[in-house]
Amino acid sequence: LVIDKEKNIIDGYGGITREINMHMAAYEENAKINCVIHAHALNSMVFASMGLDMPNISEGTQKMGEIKCLEFAPATTPELAEKVRKEVRQDQAIPKSYLLRKHGVLVVGATLEKTYDMLERLEWNAYIAKEYLIFKQLGITGIDDLVEYDYNTEE
């Protein structure tokens, strides 16, 4: 569903999400944000459900910086919207992704296309990070420790 910042439906069918307050909090805190996508992506949910920040290890997600898991707040509540508002206020960079503890993911960006692309990249990174952590725990070696990327970090 596509809505404007006054909550008018622009395109699509159905009603406005119960999570509208969370979406609006992001828009209100950063004028560069023109798209907010909330999802329950399978691999990303592993990190969100466990309350873990996601290691940002794939080249395709470097421009998102830290992938932080926010403290728990029940879905659809003003408390969750305020946690999102606080994080967006503290870090104005876009694109940006947040894990919502025990709930899902939130990706903010400049356009629908770029934000959806970042959601797909986030999910790919989640799969890679999950497998990396499993391999590391099993003592499977052969890959260097994570190295900071110094390229492909901006739009």
Name each model-derived stretch.
Residues 1-155:
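Glycine-rich flexible loops
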